[in-house]
Amino acid sequence: MKAASREALATVESKLDEFLSGDRSVATATQAGQDLFEVVRVLDGDRELRVALTDDASTSEERKSLVQTLFGGKVSPVALQVLQEAAAAQWSTPRDIARGLIILGRRALLRGAEFEGKLGQVEDELFSLSRVLDREGELTQLLSDRTATSDRKVGLLASVLYGKVTMVTEALALQAIGRPEQNPIDDLAGLADTAAKLQGRTIARVTSAGELNDSQRAALAEKLGKIYGRAMSIHSEVDTSLLGGMTIRVGDEVIDGSTAGKIARLRAQMA
C-alpha cells in the first residue's frame, strides 16, 4: 500500500478498536470480522463498487450514504460503522479498500480472541499451522493449487482443522486460504505476528536442532525479555541440520548458538 492507503488503514483501525472497546464483546468482534470478510467477497467481484466507494469526486458523506444503502441491515452495526469509516477515507487505489477491509476483519477477530483471553493461544495455533503447512508439502500444494476453487480449498482445510483449534484461528485460517494471491504459509505466519504485536510482544524467531518444550520456550522468552527489555513471543521451528543448539532472530539481529554455526566459524578461522 502507498502512503495514502496506509494512513487510511491506520485511521480506520483506530476507529475499529474504538467501536469494539465499549463492551469488549467476543460475539460483536467476531461477527464484525466475519461480516467484513463477506463484504470483501462482494468487492472482489465488483470493480465498479470498489471505484464508487473510493471515488474522490464524491464527498465522504455521499460514500458513507452509499454504504448504508447497500449494506445497512445486512451486516452487524460495528461492521457497518467500519465500512462507512473506510468509505470516508482516502485510498490510493480502489483495490486497496478491499485489502484494507481484510486487515480490519482479521483485526476484529483477533480482538475477539483478546476479549476472550485466548489471543496468545490463537497466536500459537496460527504459527503452528504455518509450520504444519511448511512440512506437509502435499497439503500445501493442494491449498496453493490455482486451478482449485477457493471453496474447495477452504473445505479441505476446514476438514483438517475442525475441532482442533479455536474458532478464531479456524476463521482466520479459512479466510487466508481463500485468498489465492497469497502464500498461505507466509500469510498464516504473518497473522501470528500480528497477534503477538496486539499483545505488545516482540517476536523472537527461534530455529533449534530439536523441538522445544513449553518450559524451555517460557524460559527462553523470559531470558530474551530481560535482554531486550520487553515481552517476547517465541516462534520456534526445528532444523536438524543445525546439529545442536539454536539460532535466534529478533528483528535484524541474529544470535547463532547452533553447533553448525560454531563449526562454520571455526572453519573460517582456520582457513
Curated annotation (Swiss-Prot):
GO terms for cellular component: plasma membrane; proton-transporting ATP synthase complex. InterPro entries: ATPase_OSCP/d_CS, ATPase_OSCP/dsu. Keywords: ATP synthesis, Cell membrane, CF(1), Hydrogen ion transport, Ion transport, Membrane, Transport. It is found in: Cell membrane. It is a peripheral membrane protein. PANTHER family: ATP SYNTHASE DELTA CHAIN (PTHR11910). F(1)F(0) ATP synthase produces ATP from ADP in the presence of a proton or sodium gradient. F-type ATPases consist of two structural domains, F(1) containing the extramembraneous catalytic core and F(0) containing the membrane proton channel, linked together by a central stalk and a peripheral stalk. During catalysis, ATP synthesis in the catalytic domain of F(1) is coupled via a rotary mechanism of the central stalk subunits to proton translocation. F-type ATPases have 2 components, F(1) - the catalytic core - and F(0) - the membrane proton channel. F(1) has five subunits: alpha(3), beta(3), gamma(1), delta(1), epsilon(1). F(0) has three main subunits: a(1), b(2) and c(10-14). The alpha and beta chains form an alternating ring which encloses part of the gamma chain. F(1) is attached to F(0) by a central stalk formed by the gamma and epsilon chains, while a peripheral stalk is formed by the delta and b chains. Belongs to the ATPase delta chain family. NCBIfam families: ATP_synt_delta (TIGR01145), PRK13430.1 (NF009967). This is ATP synthase subunit delta. The gene is atpH.
